């Protein structure tokens, strides 16, 4: 699976609604992102990096063009399906009180656990594996709101490995 084409972008235009119509942020973006490769998105403030990431993760619709993830159009995914193939770590703080790191990472299993969200033994093993992968075992029982910014980012990384 290494170097498999994972995300393919064709003639993508990003933007958002504004006074007097749609504000175009970037247009005619073509790119291919392959699994197993590090991809870096660089640019000056205000050029549309965050808008592009929000569009790629379906938090906002594209103005034009196409996005395919694993050979399937982004618009053809249900929210539940998308949650199993896309993980996003945002820079904003999540303000969660009364939740441990283990419980938060466990929430990453929600696309797989059914309506009630009860974790099976296999789900709990997956949570523990994700925590171990990011090497945050020492944070497992800490309350999320007590974490430093760096610790919180590591927890969010473990969530996307679920």
Mark where each language-model region is.
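Conserved ABC ATPase "signature" region
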Residues: 106, 121-139
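The feature captures the beta-strand-to-loop junction immediately N-terminal to the Walker
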Residues: 42-44
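Conserved small/polar residues in nucleotide/adenosyl-binding loops
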Residues: 160-162
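Conserved ABC transporter NBD signature motif
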Residues: 65-73, 82
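Helix-to-loop junction immediately C-terminal to a conserved catalytic motif
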Residues: 57
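Conserved structural motif at the start of ABC-family nucleotide-binding domains
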Residues: 7, 24-28
């Amino acid at each position: 699976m290494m170097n498999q084409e994972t995300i393919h972008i064709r003639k993508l235009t990003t933007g958002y609604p504004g006074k007097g119509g749609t504000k175009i942020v970037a247009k005619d973006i073509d790119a291919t992102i392959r699994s197993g490769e590090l991809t870096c998105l660089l640019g000056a403030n205000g050029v549309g990096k965050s808008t592009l990431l929000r569009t790629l993760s379906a938090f906002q619709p594209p103005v034009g063009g196409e996005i395919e993830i694993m050979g399937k159009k982004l618009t053809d995914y249900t929210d539940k399906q998308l949650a199993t193939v896309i993980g996003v770590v945002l820079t904003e703080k999540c303000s969660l009180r009364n939740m441990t790191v283990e419980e938060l990472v466990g929430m990453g299993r929600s696309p797989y656990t059914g309506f009630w969200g009860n974790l099976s033994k296999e789900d709990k093993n997956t949570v523990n594996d994700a925590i171990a992968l990011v090497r945050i075992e020492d944070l497992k029982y800490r309350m999320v709101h007590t974490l430093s910014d760096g610790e919180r980012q590591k927890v969010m990384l473990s969530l996307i490995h679920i």
